[in-house]
Regions:
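Generic alpha-helical structural context detector
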Residues: 19, 38-42, 63, 115, ...
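Gly/Pro-rich interdomain helix-loop hinge
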Residues: 24-108, 148
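Charged/polar positions within long, soluble alpha-helices
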Residues: 4-7, 42, 88, 122
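Short acidic alpha-helix initiation/capping motifs at coil-to-helix transition points
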Residues: 12, 84-92, 112-118
Length: 148
């Protein structure tokens, strides 16, 4: 029953990337999802470039959580940063580096992980389309901890 729910829920890029990450570095799936979440949210919102319709959804959630600010961009960023803070409060690593992923092994694997994530069926339901190069950039941000 849970599998039916997951297959109908549109899990998106975060799950596709977590599948690839867990397969390569043996990070438990829930932990991989948690680490990647703020970076995928930032990509989906378009925080580093032009804002997307997803940013407006994040801003609405931000308002509901009383994280308001003066703009859609800032509201979306507040939500993303709040997600990261909750991950840290759960004593989970907030970067791949903090999760113990070796830098050289990461560099060797990042391209293949991006390709695998792009091919993952979960990725097809992501609210923003992406390329392997964009996924690779998200993995790199998740490794270093770079958020806008």
């Amino acid at each position: 029953l849970a599998g039916i729910a997951f297959s109908n829920s549109g899990l998106g890029l975060n799950h596709g990337m977590a599948h690839a990450l867990g397969a390569r570095f043996h990070i438990p799936h829930g932990r991989a999802n948690g680490i990647l979440l703020p970076y995928v949210m930032s990509f989906n919102a378009g925080c580093a470039e032009q804002l997307t319709s997803t940013a407006k959804r994040y801003a609405r959630i931000s308002r509901l959580l009383e994280l308001e600010s003066s703009s859609v961009r800032q509201s979306a960023l507040n939500l993303i940063r709040t997600a990261r803070r909750y991950i840290e409060k759960l004593n989970m690593p907030s970067t791949l580096q903090a999760a113990g992923v070796n830098a050289a092994e990461f560099e060797e694997a990042v391209h293949d992980m991006a390709e695998a994530a792009l091919a993952d069926r979960c990725t097809a339901t992501n609210p923003r389309s992406c390329t392997a190069e964009e996924i690779e950039q998200i993995f790199r941000k998740a490794y270093s901890g770079k958020l806008p």
